[in-house]
């Protein structure tokens, strides 16, 4: 359903106190009977910001952004007063050229651990920045006695710019690229029963939509089995987790329920793994 259609259905069923679960929508009107299963973008952003604040070893923070993400860069600057802002180079007409130079970043780095936020939806820019950062990560200066600059890359908004053909996953792994996500990737070595059954039936491993459909359906069924209804299950089963997704519903003061649980993950040896906190 589109958000408009979903809101219409939820509105019509609200008078019957019938719960309505949204599998993928985030910008919904939370009627009292609505369960928004997909975490909001704000929750994902908060997860990354809290991760940055919790790491006491971080000695320097850099925010790299393009013009479209100036508001996000300024928000991060308010969260981290020490943060240095680096923006895309611009043309004579003032338009983003979606690149930075080695010198742009090198001057902002410090010895020790540096956390670098990259905020963009442009794949070429993401490719340029990650390449430059990878070349500077733990670079040893034979003429200096200072420790090298360790770079950890993060973003508050994971999107297709970080997943395209121009992106070098080796660079992302070397930079320990961290981001928040609604779902983690299942480990094929875990011998998961659902994955095995799906593969046997369709001769292919399930994609994210298939896994999410299973996780969400299983969650609703188990909540109904273990509680009188979905509403009471929020207290009886405050956190549930399945193949790739977890659900921890909270109720808005005036409105329905939203999923308050997300994963923090990172690239490690060319795979995406959960960061245990």
Residue ranges: model-predicted function:
Residues 1-2, 21-23, 60-66, 111-129, ...:
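Periplasmic-binding protein-like
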Residues 2-6, 25-29, 67-71, 122-125, ...:
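Solvent-exposed loop/turn segments at secondary-structure junctions
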Residues 3-62, 68-76:
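Extracytoplasmic ligand/sensor domains, especially the bilobed periplasmic-binding protein
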Residues 14-18, 53-57, 81, 134, ...:
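Sec-exported extracytoplasmic/periplasmic mature domains
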Residues 30-35, 98-102, 160-173:
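Glycine-rich, charge-decorated loop segments at or immediately adjacent to ligand/cofactor-binding or catalytic sites
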Residues 83-110:
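A short, well-structured beta->alpha microelement
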Residues 130-212:
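Extracellular/periplasmic periplasmic-binding protein-like sensory domains
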Residues 203-210, 221-276:
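Segments of small-molecule ligand-sensing domains
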